[in-house]
Amino acid sequence: MAENTIKWDKDADGIVTLTLDDPTGSANVMNEHYKESMHNAVERLVAEKDSITGVVITSAKKTFFAGGDLKSMINLGPENAGEAFDTVEAVKRDLRALETLGKPVVAAINGAALGGGLEIALACHHRIAADVKGLVVGLPEVTLGLLPGGGGVTRTVRMFGIQNAFMNILSQGTRFKPDKAKEIGLVDELVGSVEELVPAAKAWIKANPDAHE
């Protein structure tokens, strides 16, 4: 049985905070625990959306989300191709369901959000990052001979256009610090501390109740 890696908290205003917190590791990664937990969380959001006003996604770890589970990926071979494809498609379906929930969804980025971590944030309608030491965002998959598989290609192209997305984000594998990430549009807002993140995210939801796809 997979460990639950996402804590659910709903406040009096109907805002649900999903806190990524994998009990099996020091960082959140896109392992089987995450995949099942995110699927269950999204199903619950859809089922209860009439009583929900918005969603905040944040992390209890020092990093927001470290990306793919490299330990599992390194063991993949041709015989696992079908299974790997199905897994990636399931991840994309859940993020798309989150994106099209019909409620504003905000990523409250408290630490590094790389690869799959940034892809989770890109599925949100607003991204707030703490301007703190060590926080970087990016899609570094190309440095491993890979491309983002969780919707990052589609969403960056939609946000920035094909040439800009490819040349400046996808093909370089650059890790952007908070100020640069905001400058280029990967994040929308900066706050001065991690403690300010969730309150800022909730304030944005209240001010933008119709900010959803």
Feature map (PLM): residue ranges:
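Amphipathic alpha-helical segments at domain termini/boundaries
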Residues: 1-21, 26, 122, 164-213
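Conserved CoA-thioester-binding segment of acyl-CoA-metabolizing enzymes
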Residues: 1-58, 82, 93-96
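Glycine- (often His-adjacent) and acidic-residue-rich active-site loop
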Residues: 48-51, 59-93, 113, 143-145
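Glycine-rich beta-to-alpha active-site loop
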Residues: 97-144
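Gly/Pro- and small hydrophobic-enriched strand-loop and loop-to-helix capping segments
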Residues: 124-149, 185-201
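Hydrophobic, secondary-structure "cap" segments at the distal end of domains
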Residues: 153-164
